[in-house]
Curated annotation (Swiss-Prot):
PANTHER family: MPS ONE BINDER KINASE ACTIVATOR-LIKE MOB
Gene Ontology biological-process annotations: axo-dendritic transport; cellular response to nutrient; microtubule cytoskeleton organization; negative regulation of hippo signaling; negative regulation of synaptic assembly at neuromuscular junction; neuron projection morphogenesis; positive regulation of insulin receptor signaling pathway; positive regulation of neuroblast proliferation
MF term (GO), any: metal ion binding
Name of the protein in its database record: MOB kinase activator-like 4
Coiled-coil residues: none
Disordered: annotated span: 1-21
Keyword annotations: Metal-binding, Zinc
Matches recorded under Pfam families: Mob1_phocein
Keyword Transmembrane in record: no
GO cellular component assignments: cytoplasm; cytosol; FAR/SIN/STRIPAK complex; terminal bouton
UniProt binding sites for Zn(2+): C92, C97, H169, H174
Length: 223
């Protein structure tokens, strides 16, 4: 992208850039982004502009491949969820949260093991985000950031279900941390709208009360 005087905009932070000036380059239309990472950059651009404008962030541009759009959003959610995981470490430990739970109705089993089993909540969080990163960066299932096979797109739903449990645990057991993080990022709000819009999760599993009032049924949930 070039400025009016013909000079090229360097879209990266130069050495010595102050934190308040990070990523403060002009917005660029998606169609002018010449990169295989264009969709990711476009989504991050919208988030940086106004994280509360969930509807705009989730509005898919014309002619955009829907599979790639969903994939890139889920990658972005997982990257941002690491920020919540870091904050949770302040009070969520194997001794304080021995199981991954939300309400008393559910105990979530961790899929990172050969046979899904119970994990302390903070370990479940780490395992889930690590597993999601491994899958979403897999050359076997997602060799391209430009087009994605439908058989690979179908794997996104299971990732959504697992990472959503991080939101639900934080909401029901670490409400102050959840509220502070959500006030800054609107991440759970955006995620809830995303999975609802693209039917990636059933509404009865969306137990954090963001435009969803249903509760989960009693039981034990496997990965």
């Amino acid at each position: 992208m070039k400025m009016a005087d013909g000079s090229t905009i360097l879209r990266r932070n130069r050495p010595g850039t102050k934190s308040k000036d990070f990523c403060r380059w002009p917005d660029e239309p998606l169609e002018e982004m010449d990169s295989t990472l264009a969709v990711q950059q476009y989504i991050q651009q919208l988030i940086k502009r106004d994280p509360s404008n969930v509807e705009l962030i989730l509005t898919m541009p014309e002619a955009q491949d829907e599979g790639v759009w969903k994939y890139e959003h889920l990658r972005q959610f997982c990257m941002e969820l690491n920020g919540l995981a870091v904050r949770l470490q302040k009070e969520c430990s194997p001794s304080t949260c021995t199981q991954m739970t939300a309400t008393d109705q559910w105990i979530f089993l961790c899929a990172a093991h050969k046979t899904p089993k119970e994990c302390p909540a903070i370990d479940y969080t780490r395992h889930t985000l690590d597993g999601a990163a491994c899958l979403l960066n897999s050359n076997k299932y997602f060799p391209s950031r430009v087009s994605i096979k439908e058989s690979s797109v179908t794997k996104l739903g299971s990732v959504c279900r697992r990472v959503y449990r991080i939101f639900s645990h934080a909401y029901f057991h670490h409400r102050r941390i959840f509220d502070e993080f959500e006030a800054e990022t609107y991440l759970c709000h955006r995620f809830t709208h995303f999975v609802t819009k693209y039917n990636l999760m059933s509404k009865e599993n969306l137990i954090v009360p963001i435009n969803v009032g249903e509760n989960a049924a009693p039981g034990e949930s496997e990965a």
